[in-house]
Amino acid sequence: MAEAPMAQAPTAQAPTAEAAAEAPGLRNFTINFGPQHPAAHGVLRLVLELDGEVVERVDPHIGLLHRGTEKLIEHKTYLQAIPYFDRLDYVAPMNQEHAFCLAVEKLLGIAVPRRAQLIRVLYCEIGRILSHLLNVTTQAMDVGALTPPLWGFEEREKLMMFYERASGSRMHAAYFRVGGVHQDLPPQLVADIDSWCDSFIQVVDDLETLLTDNRIFKQRNVDIGVVTLEQAWEWGFSGVMVRGSGAAWDLRKSQPYECYAEMDFDIPIGKNGDCYDRYCLRVEEMRQSIRIMKQCIAKLRAPDGQGRVAIDDNKIFPPRRGEMKRSMESLIHHFKLYTEGFRVPEGEVYVAVEAPKGEFGVYLVSDGSNKPYKCKIRAPGFAHLQAMDFICRGHLLADVSAILGSLDIVFGEVDR
């Protein structure tokens, strides 16, 4: 019996150049995320290149909130420059003022009175809670939880009232001065902050009950946006972005400034470097901030915590109104200070503080005049945003907003 001939496989014909040109080729899809996207945290525009639902490339377009802050500061006296820093990270304004005041004080070689240091640290920790409350709750909102922002804003409202009672302004406080703070805190305000600290711990516990073990929240954040410690150092990360990857790096401990060396607090660190670890860190940092605030309040009430809230030199710090009504010399000092300002010795200095978003630095150059020659601002969010490309690569489109929420970006300081 003759075998049936084997079926020959059809030979593939190489397509001609004309046919290849006519065939629709596969290409990635490019979309705009923002600048009016609800999860964009301000005026962010991301150009995303997608392969289906998978992110291939992220291109952040910044500058939509650029106001030329660094250049404007060069044309203002050192006193007039302070309010510009409130408008950088406008979620926690006083932390930025702190860096600038420390830089000028270092050039002038002056020491701030102890009570002023305690007030500064107290309000910087209030700023940290303001920032973390907003971030943790909006990060939850970005992945679909709508209750946390309502709770968070209720507490932020109380903190903004503390800002207002100290400085007269809810957001742009301009409360810190070179040489101290503008006014002393009334005893009742200190008592109210103390009682708020006790009640706030319960709010943090309630937020954790809603989110920390929530199955949906964990699915959206665990193993998303993983950053190794090596990558964190390479990209110039700081703050929670470094601590989430396992490094106990906090300027309040490693390079203590003001009276942080006296404070007893812990530095929480993560081990996976993902969005969930960064969320857990911010929640724990709020608890540590409460610890620091309680210690500050106890020290403010102690006998050695009394006294002046600014230096005595009226050539640098404005004289009190009562003095001006009695002394012609004080009136002259006041007039000179607000018209001409004070002169800072020639030199350059870099001062960094542990702001809620990371290391906020001020590189200040003085030419001996009454205005800064150059004031370079090192914003932590700028370094974090530039890493969006490598963090988001390979993730789904829905993960982009979760990653963005965990980076904690505020555009005042990125665009400045």
Swiss-Prot record:
GO terms for molecular function: NAD binding; NADH:ubiquinone reductase (non-electrogenic) activity; quinone binding. It is an enzyme of class 7 (translocase). Its EC number is 7.1.1.-. It is a peripheral membrane protein. It catalyses: a quinone + NADH + 5 H(+)(in) = a quinol + NAD(+) + 4 H(+)(out). Gene3D superfamilies: Cytochrome-c3 Hydrogenase, chain B. It comes from the Bacteria. The keyword Translocase applies. Its main location: membrane. Coiled coil: none annotated. NDH-1 shuttles electrons from NADH, via FMN and iron-sulfur (Fe-S) centers, to quinones in the respiratory chain. The immediate electron acceptor for the enzyme in this species is believed to be ubiquinone. Couples the redox reaction to proton translocation (for every two electrons transferred, four hydrogen ions are translocated across the cytoplasmic membrane), and thus conserves the redox energy in a proton gradient. This is NADH-quinone oxidoreductase subunit D. It comes from Rhodopseudomonas palustris (strain BisB5). The gene is nuoD.
